[in-house]
């Protein structure tokens, strides 16, 4: 009986400490990366503005090639919606909110695992010279308490790095 009592006190103590730590961690997150690609701004932007192409280069598609994807609307235009379901990388939805071809920018809202809270994401292509472009891919969002504790263990930046490296390989072939 004493063992059970000490065991329960220990478990409750660990849970309490974990929740206390989470209370002091940031509830916002920022992730992203950038890369230079040896292609013109126009070529790169025409490829990245199409959300259906993301499955060719994003790292999450490589983690789970069996992702179930659904698309609604006209790809590369505001309102286009991509939803996915995956046992390995989770479920979510991505909606194009703005496309600015002149500035090489596409803005998107990301919703993870049924959340109603939009995480803001964008891809931006900038011309370095007529044959080299810089691509930025970033996301900013919120993680509710106590799930913000996961921020200590997950680094999405490496997934953005890998995705942009895959994009570079595809476009520079």
Question: Model regions: which residues?
Answer:
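Solvent-exposed, acidic/flexible segments
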Residues: 37, 41, 47, 89, ...
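Hydrophobic ligand-binding cavity/cleft-lining segments
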Residues: 2, 6-68
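A short, structured loop/turn motif at beta-sheet edges
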Residues: 38-42, 97-104, 124-134, 169-173
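Short beta-edge strand/loop motif at the mouth of beta-sheet-based domains
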Residues: 52-93
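Sec-exported extracytoplasmic/periplasmic mature domains
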Residues: 49-56, 101, 165-172
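Hydrophobic small-molecule pocket/channel-lining residues, especially in calycin-type beta-barrels
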Residues: 3, 107, 172
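Beta-strand/loop substructures that line and gate deep hydrophobic ligand-binding cavities in soluble
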Residues: 109-162, 167-169
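Structured, soluble extracytoplasmic/luminal domains of envelope-associated proteins
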Residues: 78-128
């Amino acid at each position: 009986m004493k063992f059970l009592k000490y065991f329960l006190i220990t478990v409750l103590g660990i849970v309490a400490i974990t929740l206390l730590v989470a209370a002091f961690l940031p509830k916002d997150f920022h992730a992203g990366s950038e890369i230079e690609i040896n292609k013109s701004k126009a070529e790169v932007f025409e490829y990245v503005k199409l959300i259906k192409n993301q499955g060719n280069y994003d790292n999450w598609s490589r983690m789970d090639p069996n992702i179930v994807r659904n698309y609604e609307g006209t790809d590369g235009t505001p309102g286009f919606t991509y939803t996915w379901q995956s046992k390995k990388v989770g479920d979510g939805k991505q909606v194009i909110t703005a496309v600015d071809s002149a500035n090489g920018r596409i803005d998107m809202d990301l919703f993870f695992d049924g959340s109603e809270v939009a995480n803001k994401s964008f891809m931006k292509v900038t011309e370095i010279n007529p044959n080299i472009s810089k691509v930025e891919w970033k996301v900013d969002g919120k993680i509710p308490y106590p799930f913000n504790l996961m921020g200590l263990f997950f680094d999405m930046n490496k997934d953005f790095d890998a995705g942009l490296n895959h994009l570079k390989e595809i476009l520079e072939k």
